[in-house]
């Protein structure tokens, strides 16, 4: 059965929206930081491989420490850096392609996928902040009075409409308490 939201549930809606948006922003921020760390490690590894200070076996060992989404960031950055270095032989790039295929990606498609994910995360964060701003600007009391069935019924009385906000809230809470105890 479908029942109308209680007064408390209606008031909690704005808070829950904020919480959900902030949790989503936090999730994206963590993923972004981890991906950034993966790219930094890829840069360091590329320098080490180019100078001979690092062995190729270290690629998979380092990559194994990252979450799945960061492995792609790591490999895309590593391949980009290795291609830009002059003294890297073709066999190293070929080995990187094999590792890329092992994690389920190809070189060019992976770069597009990584870029697309970064763009999507940026747009999502922008939308989250825009939504939080709009939620903050919303007149929640006006919205509440518009959607609350209790308030709509009480508003039929001219004397109720003439009350201040605190008095109207007291009326609504009293009615909800009565309803809760009548069940």
Language-model segments: residues:
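Short, conserved sequence motifs enriched in acidic/basic residues, glycine, and aromatics
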Residues: 4-5, 162
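Basic, amphipathic N-terminal segments
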Residues: 43-182
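Helix-rich C-terminal or lid/interface subdomains of diverse kinases
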Residues: 5-54
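Active-site acidic catalytic loop and adjacent metal/ATP-binding pocket
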Residues: 1
């Amino acid at each position: 059965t479908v029942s109308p939201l209680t007064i408390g549930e209606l008031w909690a809606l704005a808070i829950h929206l904020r919480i959900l948006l902030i949790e989503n922003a936090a999730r994206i921020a963590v993923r972004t930081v981890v991906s950034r760390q993966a790219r930094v490690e890829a840069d360091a590894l590329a320098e080490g491989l180019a100078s001979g200070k690092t062995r190729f076996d270290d690629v998979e060992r380092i990559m194994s420490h990252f979450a799945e989404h960061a492995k792609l960031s790591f490999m895309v950055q590593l391949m980009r850096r290795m291609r830009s270095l002059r003294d890297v032989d073709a066999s190293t790039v070929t080995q990187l392609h094999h590792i890329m295929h092992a994690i389920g990606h190809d070189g060019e498609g992976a770069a597009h996928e990584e870029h697309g994910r970064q763009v999507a995360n940026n747009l999502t964060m922008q939308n989250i902040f825009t939504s939080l701003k709009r939620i903050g600007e919303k007149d929640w009391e006006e919205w509440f009075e518009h959607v609350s069935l209790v308030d709509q019924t009480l508003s039929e009385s001219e004397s109720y409409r003439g009350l201040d906000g605190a008095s109207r809230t007291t009326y609504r809470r009293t009615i909800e308490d009565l309803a809760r105890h009548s069940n």
